[in-house]
Amino acid sequence: MGVIFENDWQELLKDEFEKEYYKKVRGFLVEEYRTKTIYPDKNHIFSALHYTAYKDVRVVILGQDPYHGPNQAHGLSFSVQPGVRIPPSLVNIYKELETDLGCYIPNHGYLKKWADQGVLLLNTSLTVRAGEANSHQKIGWEIFTDHIIQLLNDRKEPIVFILWGNNAISKERFITNPQHYIIKSVHPSPLSASRGFFGSKPFSKTNSFLESIGEKPIDWQIENR
C-alpha cells in the first residue's frame, strides 16, 4: 500500500508515510483488506488527494468516514460511484444546492466534477468495514487527515472550509489562519438537515468569497449522466 501521488501531495506527505503511527495504519489495513470487506477499494483510498492537488485546493468539504455499502465509496466525501443510488445526505446536499443556486438535482451522486475544480472532498477517516459505520475511526486516520488540514491551514492562498456536523466542526481548531473562510452548519443527514442545514446557503457563500478574492466561482451543477 505504498502511495504515489502524481502531484504536490507526494512531497508534502512523504515524511508522514514514514511515521510509526502510519506504518501501524498500513499494517492494520493490509490484514483488514485480506480478511474482510473494506471500502473503498484500496486503489481509491486517496482519491481526494489524487484528484485535487494541494496548490489547486480552493474549497474543502470535510466528511466523516466512507459510505459502508457495496459500490458506494470511491474516496471522495459524500460522493458515490456512478450507477449507485444517491445516499440521503447527498440528496439533501442537492436539495440545498437547488434552493441556493437553482441547480437541478442530477440522476447520480458522482462528485468528481467538484474535485476537478479544486474542491477537496476529504473524509476524516479514509476506510471503513462493510456495514460498520465508523469502524476504522480509531485506527490512526484522524492523525493523518488532521495533518492534511494543518497543511492546508498553512497555505498562503485563502481556502473555504465547509464543516457540516460536529465531527467536521471539531476540526475548526486546526484552521487558525484568519485569511481562510469557514462555513459551518449541522450535518446534511436526514436526522439533522432541518435544524439548520437547509437554508444555510453554503454554495453561494463559497462562490461569493471566491469572487471577492478574485477567484473563479465553483460550477456546482453536477450534470445528468
UniProtKB/Swiss-Prot annotation:
InterPro entries: UDG_fam1, Ura-DNA_Glyclase_AS, Uracil-DNA_glycosylase-like, Uracil-DNA_glycosylase-like_sf. Its main location: cytoplasm. Excises uracil residues from the DNA which can arise as a result of misincorporation of dUMP residues by DNA polymerase or due to deamination of cytosine. SUPFAM superfamilies: Uracil-DNA glycosylase-like. Its EC number is 3.2.2.27. Belongs to the uracil-DNA glycosylase (UDG) superfamily. UNG family. It is an enzyme of class 3 (hydrolase). It is found in: Cytoplasm. GO terms for molecular function: uracil DNA N-glycosylase activity. The active site is at D65. Keywords: Cytoplasm, DNA damage, DNA repair, Hydrolase. It catalyses: Hydrolyzes single-stranded DNA or mismatched double-stranded DNA and polynucleotides, releasing free uracil. CDD domains: UDG-F1-like (cd10027). GO terms for biological process: base-excision repair, AP site formation via deaminated base removal. It comes from the Bacteria. This is Uracil-DNA glycosylase. One of its GO terms (cellular component) is cytoplasm. Pfam families: UDG.
